Amino acid sequence: MKGIICFALVFTFATSVFAAALSGTVHFSGTAPAPQRVDMNADPTCASAHTEPVYADDVVVNSNNTLKNVFVYVKTGLEGKTFETPPNLVVLDQKGCKYEPHVFGIQVNQPLEIRNSDPTLHNVHGMPKETKEFNLGMPIQGMKLTRKFD
């Protein structure tokens, strides 16, 4: 894929002179890759969940050349500063045999709830770089499991 990704970032200063909220838009230039169709026929439940074709969410270029499902993180934070882990639950749901949301951020020790909203077996295989890998079968619709990355 030949293309250039440009970041347009906006900084909004919070109450502290040294803290800021970061938001922005990621633009794609060049020829957008063709969407890759996902074959849902391996599981009849998944196939019947969709009346329209399903496409992979790996690279999604919107009509205005912005990218969907982009995550930007700050690799090195403020020196000498530590911040508490947000207590709010991050939810990863399997709906229509697709993960929702496709991309999300989570901090160390922040709870992740993994849900299966489908009436079929799903497998969730987490492969974090720094912590223990997990591979969970979720055979029951409505099933919920909670994990933390430490």
Predicted regions and their residues:
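Extracytoplasmic copper-binding redox domains, predominantly the cupredoxin/blue-copper superfamily
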Residues: A19-D150
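Sec/Tat signal peptide C-region and signal peptidase I cleavage site
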Residues: F13-A19
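Hydrophobic alpha-helical segments and their boundary regions
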Residues: A8-L9, F13, K98
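Positively charged n-region of N-terminal signal peptides that target proteins for export
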Residues: M1-L9
